[in-house]
């Protein structure tokens, strides 16, 4: 009898201890890595895209509209700096934690990489345009223009002619 009481107490204590050490917070499971992928793909990738024949890195960046070419290259370094190793049929990372989902809003193409998904007004950049001129023309602050077009570098030297930028939220 003493042995069964002691056993019952021990089992109760063990169960209580286990309950106290069990985490109460759920951790999101990582996305299953599809096959095939190139070496060096981001370990924390949560969203993958299967490249089609004829795709380019810039096309993928433009189609998703929520990350820059720099992000794409960082997540998929094996594609090469000039995207020379992008392979149709292979999977590429198009989202890590914190990356918004693919833009589903209608927008003109091509768009400046990193442009806002939801945009109230688009403008097709002309040869000779620069950030300051567009900010003045559309009465938008530099801070807001860059927020709407997150892929622009500090010098704004990557603003491209014949590409659409967001000029109004």
Curated annotation (Swiss-Prot):
Residues 47-94, 121-167 form the LysM domain. PROSITE patterns: LYSM. Keywords: Chitin-binding, Repeat, Signal, Virulence. Disruption phenotype: Lead to relative tolerance against H(2)O(2)-induced oxidative stress. Impaired fungal virulence in both injection and topical infection bioassays using the last instar larvae of the wax moth Galleria mellonella. Impairs fungal propagations and ability in suppressing immune responses in insects. GO terms for molecular function: chitin binding. Residues 1-19 form the signal peptide. PANTHER family: AM15, PEPTIDOGLYCAN-BINDING LYSIN DOMAIN. Secreted effector that enables the plant pathogenic fungus to manipulate host defenses for successful infection. Required for the full virulence to infect insect hosts. Protects fungal hyphae against the hydrolytic activity of chitinase and plays an important role in evasion of insect immunities. Binds chitin and can additionally bind chitosan and cellulose. Coats and protects the cell walls of insect pathogens from host cell recognition and additionally shields fungal cells from the hydrolysis of insect chitinases. The LysM (lysin motif) domains are small globular domains involved in binding chitin in eukaryotes. Blys5 contains 2 LysM domains. This is Secreted LysM effector Blys5. It comes from Beauveria bassiana (strain ARSEF 2860) (White muscardine disease fungus).
């Amino acid at each position: 009898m003493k042995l069964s009481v002691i056993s019952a107490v021990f089992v109760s204590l063990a169960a209580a201890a286990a309950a106290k050490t069990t985490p109460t917070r759920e951790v999101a499971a990582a996305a299953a890595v599809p096959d095939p992928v190139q070496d060096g793909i981001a370990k924390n990738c949560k969203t993958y895209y299967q490249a089609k024949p004829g795709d380019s890195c810039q096309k993928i960046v433009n189609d998703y509209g929520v990350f820059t070419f720099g992000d794409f290259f960082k997540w998929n370094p094996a594609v090469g700096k000039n995207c020379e190793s992008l392979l149709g049929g292979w999977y590429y990372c198009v989202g890590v934690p914190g990356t918004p989902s693919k833009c589903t809003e209608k927008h003109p193409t091509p768009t400046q990489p990193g442009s806002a998904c939801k945009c109230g007004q688009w403008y097709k950049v002309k040869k000779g345009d620069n950030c300051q001129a567009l900010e003045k023309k559309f009465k938008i602050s530099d801070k807001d223009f860059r927020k709407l077009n997150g892929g622009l570098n500090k010098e704004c030297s990557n603003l491209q002619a014949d590409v659409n930028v967001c000029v109004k939220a």
